[in-house]
Amino acid sequence: MAYFRRNFYGGRRHYYRRRNAYTRRRYRRVRRRHRGRRFPYFKQGKRRRTRLLHVTDPRYKAHCTITGWVPIAMTRIQLISQPFTVDTLSPFHVYPGGYGYGVFTLEAMYKEHLMKRNRWSRSNAGFDLGRYLGTWLTLVPHPYFSYLFYYDPEYGNTFEFKKLIHPAIMITHPKTILVLSNKRGGNRRKWPRMWIPRPAIFADGWEFQKDLCQHGLFAFGWAWVDLDRPWMADISKPAQTIDPSTYDKKNDMINKVPNMWWKEAANDWLTEWGRPQGSGVTQQFNQLAMAGPFVLKTNKSEYVNTELLQIILFYKSHFQWGGEFLQDKVLADPTKIPPAQTAYYQQAGQTNLYGSPYKPLSSGLHDSISELPIASPPQNPHKYTVRPSDYDKDGILTEESFRRLTDSPYTSDGGHSFSSFSTASDPLEGTSRYARPLGRKTTREPSRRRKRRRRSPSPEDEETAPIPPKSNSEPSISGPGRATRKQLLQRLFRRLLTSSPQ
């Protein structure tokens, strides 16, 4: 193979390789002393072999993608540097802060599904195992303010994680994403998108969904950042804190506290409600004290045109459901499922196979608005699942597992024992879909048919009629239909004795 580079004469050469300008010098071959292997290939007379790790997957597997959105920030511009606070007295105002953090879990995603905030591509019904693969996050920039977003799959204590959510600390971390505002970064740029792998503590094996809900998938934190004034804001009037009683007579440092010109008792009702409210600056002073490098300042700027700041987050998590149940699969009759196109091309007045008018599809793969039914929350696996922990050391089902598997789903009141609704609110109670419970006395309506008259027995009936027993020790016979073999033999023997000649 020819390769081209500049030669000593300049320009590009047009031959395979450069001609040797001098005869190549030949060296004597020197024998090399070989050292032994650092890691012995043979140990104690046996060759080292690679051990294989076998992982058994469940028989049935299904891929599920959970796509949704979640609001992560809703703050006010006046209280960016303060934490989330709520008034303890009326009117109970809510003051959100300028940073936040949270943890993504499978249980939280199920609760978000109940609020119609996410969509599951595959239902978890019929599966008791689960495996987490990872999550895609898409960050939406704010029109006027920039913020920092930080994620950590291997997080520890959430209280210690909260201490590190500061713009001056997060801005130097490699896992921090700087989301510039549209005012600074432009409106045509792409939204930041990142892939968060599963934590290192998660092995490649499967877990029960109930156990998977107890593990946090990843933790995240966010905080507003000020890149225009990272150190301090524009100060118009400095706060006087040396002698408030002399310099600021009507500009008290604490709201609703009167000027202390003389000593008096501290009456709570008088201090809180009896005096007029002054124009205190304690709140503004605390904001300046709590602010630090890169903290968003609350002074008015050219970018501030709204008081309530909001951020949303889009996520797309990947899971796998698996397992095998000792139950039949629920199938649909393919002859009774109309095509998806018929719901859009039917005219008014036409009916389907059942005689009812066509209606738009409410479920199915062709409907982009419908949702798959999530039968049960992931933290409640199916009760009829046979797990490895249900067997003892000899491979036999334990007593508790056998009782759980053989328990009837119907109770004495007619309702399901594993459902939350009662018998009174059950719309299907009393129909043919429910089995008749044990121990309940059912009353039948009197028959309108005319009762048949009893006729006198014929001679043939008298011969075949049962003979009453002679003593109490003999078994009683209620009829020829219920007679056992022993009773029939006794009846035949007694008839032979009565019919024999004297």
From Swiss-Prot:
Major localisation: virion
Region called Disordered, residue ranges: 369-392, 405-487
Keyword tags: Capsid protein, T=1 icosahedral capsid protein, Virion
Location in or out of the cell: Virion
Sequence similarity: Belongs to the anelloviridae capsid protein family.
Described function: Self-assembles to form an icosahedral capsid with a T=1 symmetry, about 30 nm in diameter, and consisting of 60 capsid proteins. The capsid encapsulates the genomic DNA. Capsid protein is involved in attachment and entry into the host cell.
Protein name: Capsid protein
Source organism (scientific name): Torque teno tupaia virus (isolate Tbc-TTV14)
